[in-house]
């Protein structure tokens, strides 16, 4: 029991010290701790969430849960009808959308006579042939409309155009990112693809903040296939949406077990992520940790200064305590308890703000970045780790100044001598 006496007395002194301290001082320290915790969690969470928004968009509106594409040595997915029959017999699959993809050129104002040296109002693009109903069931393409109407299966000579192909929605003057001028819903453009030339009407504009979608022109597949000489029913991409609860890795392996990998690449949405997206995830996570670490150092210094000033101010009081027999260890423990109080209350307040306020709000109202809808990515494990880091840093910052003051001469402290 004697070993616990310094702890009990230290706790009593800490409680007394907190109660007698200025209410505004306590509030200020707690706010600093809460803001420090938010800095540790939110800054890295938003930076990671910015890239997570890109990943979410690509998964939702492009690859879906499983993505099948042509092998590198082939121009298309061989034996597509066989693959579709395999997919049809897997009960965990909710919907499938095969696509035909071909490079092409879109032209606006193509009837205007230009000099030979002029480039013209044109842009290189990717031409996609889709079944509008199947594509919408898998990727929700119709939800990306920002102008006009969605395609129907009978919409021949009508197309959807990605926003990055139009100057009205992507006004960047660069040869690397060509965009059409004076083109909007209702405009007629000329499409050149695989030697075929077709005049089509823009029925709708789509924007997703993913280049794979926003730099495409979408045709009804039954019209595009004859234009590119594709009469064999082979596709270039197949996006697969799973039923809720189905595991993409398990279904991918099941599809591969049926021999589909002999004719195409079968990937989960994570496998199909572009490498630059994966690299950006790691980079932004590192940046978030660096910025959070700076905030942690600032908070530690703040706690150190507050505890040190508090201890210096009560130097005479500390000397009297030592004079009546209270050990220096007990006094140090009391200041550690004070630091624990500020750390626990501040961290708890920060957790409430994150999980009850910021996280649900940003999920419902993502931050509108130019290339993604940013969300706040926080995990329970990550939150616990950061809370522990802040707690330990606060304890150290509370102990060191108390130790420095307590080690002083007792008589000098009582008499106020330096």
Question: Which positions does each model-derived feature cover?
Answer:
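N-terminal Sec/SRP start-transfer signal
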Residues: 1-41, 418
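Peri-transmembrane interface segments
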Residues: 20-27, 248-301, 310-314, 321, ...
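Alpha-helical transmembrane segments of integral membrane proteins
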Residues: 29-39, 285-305, 339-350, 385-386, ...
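Hydrophobic, regular-secondary-structure patches
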Residues: 38-126, 133-136, 147-150, 257
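Short beta-strand boundary microenvironments
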Residues: 118-176
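Basic-flanked hydrophobic alpha-helices used for secretion and membrane insertion
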Residues: 149, 160-267
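Transmembrane alpha-helical interface segments in multi-pass membrane proteins
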Residues: 295, 308, 317-362, 393, ...
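Short helix-loop junctions at transmembrane helix boundaries
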Residues: 333, 347-392, 399-412
């Amino acid at each position: 029991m004697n070993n616990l006496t310094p702890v009990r007395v230290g706790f009593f002194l800490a409680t007394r010290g907190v109660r007698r301290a200025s209410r505004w001082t306590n509030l200020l320290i707690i706010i600093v701790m809460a803001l420090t915790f938010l800095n540790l969690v939110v800054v890295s969470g938003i930076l990671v969430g910015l890239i997570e928004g890109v990943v979410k968009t690509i998964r939702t509106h492009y690859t879906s849960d499983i993505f099948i594409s042509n092998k590198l040595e082939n121009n298309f997915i061989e034996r597509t009808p066989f693959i579709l029959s395999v997919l049809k017999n897997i009960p965990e699959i909710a919907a499938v959308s095969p696509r035909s993809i071909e490079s092409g050129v879109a032209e606006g104002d193509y009837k205007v006579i230009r000099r030979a040296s002029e480039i013209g109002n044109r842009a290189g693009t990717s031409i996609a042939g889709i079944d509008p109903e199947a594509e919408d069931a898998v990727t929700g393409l119709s939800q990306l409309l920002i102008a006009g109407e969605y395609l129907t299966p009978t919409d021949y000579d009508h197309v959807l155009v990605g926003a990055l192909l139009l100057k009205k929605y992507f006004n960047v003057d660069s040869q690397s990112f060509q965009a059409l001028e004076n083109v909007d819903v209702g405009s007629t453009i000329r499409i050149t693809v695989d030697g075929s030339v077709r005049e089509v009407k823009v029925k709708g504009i789509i924007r997703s903040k993913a280049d794979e979608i926003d730099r495409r022109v979408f045709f009804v597949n039954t019209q595009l296939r004859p234009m590119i000489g594709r009469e064999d029913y082979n596709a270039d991409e197949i996006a697969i949406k799973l039923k809720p609860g189905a595991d993409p890795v398990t279904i991918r392996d099941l599809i591969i077990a049926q021999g589909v990998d002999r004719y195409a690449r079968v990937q989960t949405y994570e496998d199909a992520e572009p490498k630059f997206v994966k690299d950006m995830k790691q980079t932004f996570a590192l940046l978030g940790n660096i910025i959070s670490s700076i905030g942690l150092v600032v908070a530690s210094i703040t706690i150190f200064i507050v505890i040190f000033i508090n201890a210096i101010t009560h130097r005479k009081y500390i000397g009297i305590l030592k004079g009546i027999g209270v050990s220096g260890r007990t006094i140090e423990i009391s200041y550690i308890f004070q630091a624990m109080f500020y750390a626990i209350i501040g961290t708890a307040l920060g957790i409430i703000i994150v999980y009850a306020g910021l996280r649900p709000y940003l999920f419902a109202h993502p931050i509108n970045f130019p290339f993604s809808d940013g969300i706040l990515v926080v995990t329970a494990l990550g939150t616990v780790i950061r809370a522990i880091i802040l707690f330990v840093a606060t304890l150290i910052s509370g102990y060191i100044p108390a130790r420095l003051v307590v080690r002083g001469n007792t008589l000098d402290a009582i008499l106020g001598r330096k």
